[in-house]
């Protein structure tokens, strides 16, 4: 058993929202609305329990990565015969906040059950579900279906590695192309995309400081996107596994 390896993922702003509902007797709801539950203010305690649950997700679930939480909010809605909980969890991380949002809702509902168990033996937690998530790979990753690529490399082994990644992305190969990738040899770049190059360099350095100096260059030459990769299997795999999905985004924005 093991966790999913997220080493190659990019840290991005991510958000998840979840929902849950517990059914209660109308008499119990009345006590909640009148703030007469013996253990105290149920609504506020439920919000706090949800926040606490979100923070403890990585400890409760063995395969869930512990990730930083930049924002957690719980909304509690008291209805005639049920109580609804909505959670929002946000942060900058390599993986999403779905489990944190779901755990927040679940913990909040369990708190309702705990605070009311002496008052209501008919309670049922009816539903817990993810409402939405954003900021992950699905938001910015674009395949290269229909994109023509000119791939140049003297080293056949390195060429095959890059070719396999490009095929997996859906690219086709041609002499006249909209994307030119060179392994080892420089190609003329009229306008380098400095912001992306800096991000790539930063992530590259964090992965392996000993490889610093073997730069990956990205930019435009006329109407074609140019990518220059060093003759390094590690660098080639790093680029495609971490930033391969951004290539399609660049071409779409051109």
Swiss-Prot record:
Q: Which organism is it from?
A: Aquifex aeolicus (strain VF5)
| Similarity-based family | In the N-terminal section; belongs to the MoaC family.
Q: Which reaction does it catalyse?
A: (8S)-3',8-cyclo-7,8-dihydroguanosine 5'-triphosphate = cyclic pyranopterin phosphate + diphosphate
Task: Return one Gene Ontology term, BP aspect.
Answer: Mo-molybdopterin cofactor biosynthetic process
Q: Which Pfam families match?
A: MoaC
This protein's pathway reads: Cofactor biosynthesis; molybdopterin biosynthesis
What does UniProt list as catalytic? Answer: 114
Q: Which InterPro entries match?
A: MoaC, MoaC_bact/euk, MoaC_sf, Mopterin_CF_biosynth-C_dom
User: For binding substrate, which residues are annotated in this chain's numbering?
Assistant: 63-65, 99-100
Q: Which GO terms describe its molecular function?
A: cyclic pyranopterin monophosphate synthase activity
**Key words of the record:** Lyase, Molybdenum cofactor biosynthesis
Q: How does it assemble?
A: Homohexamer; trimer of dimers.
Record keyword Amino-acid biosynthesis present: no
Q: Where is this region: Molybdenum cofactor biosynthesis protein C?
A: 1-143
Q: Where is this region: Unknown?
A: 144-254
Any idea what this protein is called? Cyclic pyranopterin monophosphate synthase
Reported function: Catalyzes the conversion of (8S)-3',8-cyclo-7,8-dihydroguanosine 5'-triphosphate to cyclic pyranopterin monophosphate (cPMP).
Which EC numbers characterise this protein's activity in its record? 4.6.1.17
From the broadest rank down, the organism's phylogenetic lineage runs: Bacteria, Pseudomonadati, Aquificota, Aquificia, Aquificales
């Amino acid at each position: 058993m093991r966790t999913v390896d997220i080493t190659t993922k990019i840290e991005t702003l991510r958000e998840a929202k979840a929902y849950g509902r517990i059914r209660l007797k109308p008499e119990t709801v009345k006590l909640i609305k009148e703030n007469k539950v013996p253990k105290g203010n149920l609504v506020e305690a439920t919000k706090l329990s949800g926040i606490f649950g979100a923070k403890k997700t990585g400890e409760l679930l063995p395969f869930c990565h512990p990730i930083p939480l930049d924002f957690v909010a719980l909304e509690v809605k008291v209805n005639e015969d049920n109580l609804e909980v909505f959670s929002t969890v946000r942060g900058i991380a390599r993986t999403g906040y779905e489990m944190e949002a779901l755990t927040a809702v679940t913990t909040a509902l369990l708190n309702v059950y705990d605070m009311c168990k002496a008052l209501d033996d008919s309670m049922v937690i009816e539903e817990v579900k993810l409402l939405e998530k954003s900021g992950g790979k699905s938001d910015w990753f674009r395949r290269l279906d229909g994109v023509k690529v000119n791939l140049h490399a003297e080293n056949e082994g390195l060429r095959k590695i890059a070719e396999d990644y490009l095929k997996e992305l859906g690219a086709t190969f041609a002499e006249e192309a909209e994307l030119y990738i060179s392994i080892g040899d420089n190609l003329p770049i009229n306008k380098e995309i400095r912001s992306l190059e800096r991000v790539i360099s930063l992530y590259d350095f964090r992965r392996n400081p000993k490889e610093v100096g073997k730069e990956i260059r990205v930019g435009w030459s006329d109407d074609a996107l140019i990518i220059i990769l060093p003759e390094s299997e590690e660098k080639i795999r790093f680029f495609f596994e971490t930033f391969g999905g951004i290539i399609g985004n660049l071409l779409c924005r051109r």
